[in-house]
């Protein structure tokens, strides 16, 4: 009958914990020795107890094993660093080639370095330029249409604002006129002013009429007086002739 599964957790009882440590330590050292003998492996084991006591096992020496460990670790780090460096160099080379290709393409698009290009390359470049020109014109047309639509929208908004202000102004003027008609003080003042203006105008008209009548009478009087003088002169002439 096998033993039950032991739960792996810290043993709280100090004595029990010390006994378990002693038994497990001996078993672990035995296993390390067996592994080194059976498999011809370099094995080193270092154990520190709770009290700080050192226990060790090594078939070749703990110091030698530690030195070998550091050498292997440094080599691994160097290998990893070398691989990383080589990978970075390859990436830089790829990016440099891509940059040079893009720079050469840009020069070709602006009409530079065309001497060494073949007919096929020139035809390809021509198609690219035509496509770029078509796309540019299309985008330009779209931007202009959007700007025109925006201007129309602003024009409509300004027209609405203008109509609204016009209606508000007309309504304000109409209300002011209504208030003027409904206010008795203002109405009386307006009537008085109107009466004064009418009287003044009538007075001016009467003066003009009187002046006209006076002028007519004076002319008539002068004409009548002239006739009397003429008649008197004629009478005097007649009397003189009679005496003669």
UniProtKB/Swiss-Prot annotation:
The entry's localization annotation reads: Nucleus
Identify the residues that the record assigns to the MADS-box domain, covering every copy: 3-57
A Pfam family recorded for this sequence: K-box
Q: Where do the K-box domain residues begin and end?
A: 85-175
Q: Which SUPFAM superfamilies match?
A: SRF-like
Can you name one GO molecular function term for this protein?
A: protein dimerization activity
UniProtKB keywords: DNA-binding, Nucleus, Transcription, Transcription regulation
Q: Which Gene3D superfamilies match?
A: Transcription factor, MADS-box (3.40.1810.10)
For this chain's UniProt record, which GO biological process terms are given? plant ovule development; pollen development; positive regulation of transcription by RNA polymerase II; regulation of gene expression
CDD domains per record: MADS_MEF2_like (cd00265)
Q: Which GO terms describe its cellular component?
A: nucleus
The keyword Heme appears for this protein: no
- Which InterPro entries does the protein's record reference? MADS-box/MEF2_TF, MEF2-like_N, TF_Kbox, TF_MADSbox, TF_MADSbox_sf
> Which SMART domains would you find in this protein's record?
MADS
**What is this protein's function?**
Probable transcription factor.
Query: What is the protein name for this chain?
Result: Agamous-like MADS-box protein AGL13
> Which organism does this record belong to?
Arabidopsis thaliana
């Amino acid at each position: 009958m096998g033993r039950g599964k032991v739960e792996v957790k810290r043993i709280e009882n100090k004595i029990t914990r010390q006994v378990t440590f002693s038994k497990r330590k001996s078993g672990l050292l035995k296993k390390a020795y067996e592994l080194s003998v059976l498999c011809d492996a370099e094995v080193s084991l270092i154990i520190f107890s709770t009290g700080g006591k050192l226990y060790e096992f090594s078939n070749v020496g703990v110091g030698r094993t530690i030195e070998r460990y550091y050498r292997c670790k440094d080599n691994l780090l160097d290998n990893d660093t070398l691989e990383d460096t080589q990978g970075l160099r390859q990436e830089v080379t790829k990016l440099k080639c891509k940059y040079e290709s893009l720079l050469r393409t840009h020069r070709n698009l602006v009409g530079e370095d065309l001497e060494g290009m073949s007919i096929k390359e020139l035809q390809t470049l021509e198609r690219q330029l035509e496509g770029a020109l078509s796309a540019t014109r299309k985008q330009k047309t779209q931007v202009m249409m959007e700007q025109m639509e925006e201007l129309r929208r602003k024009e409509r908004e300004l027209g609405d604002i203008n109509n609204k202000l016009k209606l508000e102004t007309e309504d304000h003027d109409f209300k002011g006129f209504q208030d003027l008609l409904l206010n008795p003080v203002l109405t009386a003042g307006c009537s008085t002013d109107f009466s004064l203006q009418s009287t003044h105008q009538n007075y001016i008209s009467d003066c003009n009429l009187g002046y006209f009548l006076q002028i007519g009478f004076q002319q008539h009087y002068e004409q009548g007086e002239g006739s009397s003088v003429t008649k008197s002169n004629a009478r005097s002439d007649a009397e003189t002739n009679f005496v003669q």
